[in-house]
Amino acid sequence: VRITIDYTPALRQSAGIGRYTRGLIGALAALDRQNQYTLFCAGQAPGAGSTDGASWPPNFRVRVVPWQARHLGIAWHRLQLPLPAEWLAGPTDLFHSPDFTLPPLARARGVVTVHDLSFLTVPECADPRLRAFLERAVPGAVRRARRVLADSASTANDLNRLLGVPAEKISVVPAGIEPRFEPVRDPACLARVRARYRLPERFILGLGTLEPRKNFVRLIQAYAELQRRAPLPQNLVIAGGPGWLYEGIYAEARRQAAPERICFPGFVADEDLPALYTLADAFAFPSLYEGFGIPPLEAMACGTPVICANNSSLPEAVGDAALLVDATDVGGLAGGLLGLLGDGALRARLVTAGLARAGRFTWSDAAAGLLAAYRQTML
């Protein structure tokens, strides 16, 4: 079967969908040597190798088109020009778009990955321009696609409930956790990362794009309440690049009695994440909605206990290996943090359970699920 995958998100996005695409397609390249794959890249070429540095196998080829991704997006999704993807990517039997939208197709069967429906479930947390675009593009994409992929059963249920996608048309392909996410034992590496990001000696870690959906304002409020209840030595570190309405997060930190206890190191490079997780006393992930939620599992893989929101796909991802709380309850979040930091037995149980839980999610399993979805698409 000739399969074309839009690899552009892997080149344009360092985290999130970019990381998902790199991990999944890298594992697929290691798994499948029978089908013929084209990696469609708009405007730029990938490196010479796959995600693990090895060469792409002979059944994978890269097709770079001179159009920038932004211009293609305008042509396909805003102007709705009838420009079939095959005209740019070459003849193919199946075209997979891993980033919510699906271009016009002449004969190929379409597969689209919808990572979440946050633009419908928590619309107040989405950039209005992006929300308006997704509200137009995603319903059409899932309608035209032969198969729709979701990162979790929670997102699959949302697709069925909110967009009417038949359950039999959806395949769930969870993300994997890379083997490099493990407890870092090298003191020099830990010291280097601590110095690079000016991290305090002890801290609670929050990680994600600084935007309303990640719920960092309530995390800051919970931390302030925690310090009023029972002052603890841990600072609060919120790492991530600025997103939509990020200024409100900084403003909330300044409003607190001891803003110097709240640190914003900015975007953290991928290679530094295992050390960052390892250095933290606890990882807090109070997001209002997630299609899957990779960071809590990465933290678990690094031996860090996790407190996590109990909404959307997060209970499905973390199971009983995290302390689950209501993301909208500041007092409950503060109480959960206090328990997590103060109860040694609870911490030990969550560390052990977390390591086991994270080990259940591998990119090789995800690639096997993707290949099964491709086979179903071609039936």
Language-model region placement:
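Carbohydrate transferase catalytic cores enriched for Leloir-type hexosyltransferases
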Residues: V1-L379
